[in-house]
């Protein structure tokens, strides 16, 4: 499974990807993505292979630790390591080919944008479940 940013400068491949993703509806993810929710999945660090443009990746880290990596040319969010883990967050919107991913869960559903309808598929969570439960849900 391959992906790249809007300008094509940053490219990556995900090996043995999950078949499911999550959508986060928190205000940080809305601001980071510019959309009503942020669709993504999580993989082990060794499953992500950078193919091009790693030198174009810039990071913004809030004092709370929230991190957003992005292409310094086009601004697209790009994969970034999850703090204190051996996992990487991968934004699903960067994927190149049709991948058939389904939504396993919605996070921070109580914080969803007022214009966004309540999702009808996937588990609904008011906050983030334990990390092990998120991983389990993405692999189910």
Tell where the protein language model's regions lie, with residue ranges.
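A short Gly-Trp-Pro
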Residues: 1-140
């Amino acid at each position: 499974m391959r992906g790249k940013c809007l300008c094509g400068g940053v490219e990556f491949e995900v090996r043995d990807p999950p078949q499911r993703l999550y959508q986060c509806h928190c205000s940080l993810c809305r601001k980071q993505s510019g959309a009503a929710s942020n669709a993504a999945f999580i993989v082990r660090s060794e499953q992500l292979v950078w193919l091009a443009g790693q030198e174009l990746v810039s990071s913004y880290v809030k004092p709370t630790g929230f991190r957003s990596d992005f292409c310094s040319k086009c601004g697209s969010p790009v994969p970034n390591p999850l703090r204190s883990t051996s996992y990487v967050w991968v934004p699903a919107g960067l994927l190149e080919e049709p991948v058939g991913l389904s939504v396993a869960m919605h996070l921070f559903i109580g914080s969803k944008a007022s214009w966004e309808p309540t999702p009808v598929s996937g588990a609904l969570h008011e906050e983030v479940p334990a990390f092990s439960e998120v991983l389990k849900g993405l692999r189910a």
